[in-house]
Amino acid sequence: MQYILKLKYYLYNITWKLVFICVMLVLLIVGIHKNIKWVCDYYSGPLSYIIVTGNRFFTTNDDINYIILKSGVLGTFITQDVNIIQKQIKQMPWIQKVSVRKQWPNTLKINLIEYIPIAYWNNEFISTTGVVFSVSECLYNEYSSFVRKMYQEIPILYGPTGKDQEVLNNYLRFSAILKSSNFQIKSVKTDTCYTWQLVLDNNVCLKLGCVNLIERLHYFIKVYPFLVKEMDEKNKYIDYVDLRYNSGCSVRWIHNMIDPVFHAINNVSKGSHDYD
């Protein structure tokens, strides 16, 4: 009799333990199901926020919105292919690098690196890394005051198609030499014969010709103080300095910015043609 009671008690305990375990398993399964459903619902929501980082000078918010709309309606965190958007943004000519990634749960993050223009090149721009790129004219109205100021300060380079690197390199060489005497270059121009011409920030034009360019720049720096003295004494302005002579240079003077007068230095006559 005592044995039967112990057996019943044992079976009773086993039954309740099994019931408890079953209940806990059911609750666990229900909880997991609800969590999975919540996660799926959370991730199935559309990407609704866009964060754009990086130093943007040319890229406007309208550009980003247009590209995203062009790529189709934004998907969810799981379904959206960021490579499509990244490829579309990279096609903008002023974009150097772009990174597009998703940030949980509903944000698209875009980081941009644009080419920084060092100068105008013909009707385009040339970057600090020597890459020629263009910018839509309609974007100019969107530029910040900083960018407008930058455009006013960068030089203008002209030259035959395909010679952008050579012109840029010479600009950098000329600029380094003139900077030591507080001159800045507004424009550099060369033609198919590779004759070079500069315009400085004081609007003085330098005609360098096609040979001995560096030597001629140094010569200009040497004689410029004498030209300044004459400008002050006679109230004249320099139109251009012709440095193409084998020795010396000639100066075209302008009185009151109207009448041209020619002046020669170092015994070089006005009509002489002994230059390159």
Swiss-Prot record:
<keyword id="KW-0132">Cell division</keyword>
<feature type="transmembrane region" description="Helical">
    <location>
        <begin position="12"/>
        <end position="32"/>
    </location>
</feature>
<feature type="domain" description="POTRA">
    <location>
        <begin position="45"/>
        <end position="115"/>
    </location>
</feature>
<keyword id="KW-1003">Cell membrane</keyword>
<dbReference type="InterPro" id="IPR045335">
    <property type="entry name" value="FtsQ_C_sf"/>
</dbReference>
<dbReference type="InterPro" id="IPR026579">
    <property type="entry name" value="FtsQ"/>
</dbReference>
<comment type="function">
    <text>Essential cell division protein. May link together the upstream cell division proteins, which are predominantly cytoplasmic, with the downstream cell division proteins, which are predominantly periplasmic. May control correct divisome assembly.</text>
</comment>
<dbReference type="InterPro" id="IPR013685">
    <property type="entry name" value="POTRA_FtsQ_type"/>
</dbReference>
<keyword id="KW-1133">Transmembrane helix</keyword>
<dbReference type="GO" id="GO:0043093">
    <property type="term" value="P:FtsZ-dependent cytokinesis"/>
</dbReference>
<feature type="topological domain" description="Periplasmic">
    <location>
        <begin position="33"/>
        <end position="276"/>
    </location>
</feature>
<comment type="similarity">
    <text>Belongs to the FtsQ/DivIB family. FtsQ subfamily.</text>
</comment>
<dbReference type="Pfam" id="PF08478">
    <property type="entry name" value="POTRA_1"/>
</dbReference>
<dbReference type="GO" id="GO:0090529">
    <property type="term" value="P:cell septum assembly"/>
</dbReference>
<feature type="topological domain" description="Cytoplasmic">
    <location>
        <begin position="1"/>
        <end position="11"/>
    </location>
</feature>
<protein>
    <recommendedName>
        <fullName>Cell division protein FtsQ</fullName>
    </recommendedName>
</protein>
<keyword id="KW-0472">Membrane</keyword>
<dbReference type="InterPro" id="IPR034746">
    <property type="entry name" value="POTRA"/>
</dbReference>
<dbReference type="InterPro" id="IPR005548">
    <property type="entry name" value="Cell_div_FtsQ/DivIB_C"/>
</dbReference>
<dbReference type="GO" id="GO:0032153">
    <property type="term" value="C:cell division site"/>
</dbReference>
<dbReference type="Pfam" id="PF03799">
    <property type="entry name" value="FtsQ_DivIB_C"/>
</dbReference>
<keyword id="KW-0997">Cell inner membrane</keyword>
<keyword id="KW-0812">Transmembrane</keyword>
<keyword id="KW-0131">Cell cycle</keyword>
<dbReference type="GO" id="GO:0005886">
    <property type="term" value="C:plasma membrane"/>
</dbReference>
<comment type="subunit">
    <text>Part of a complex composed of FtsB, FtsL and FtsQ.</text>
</comment>
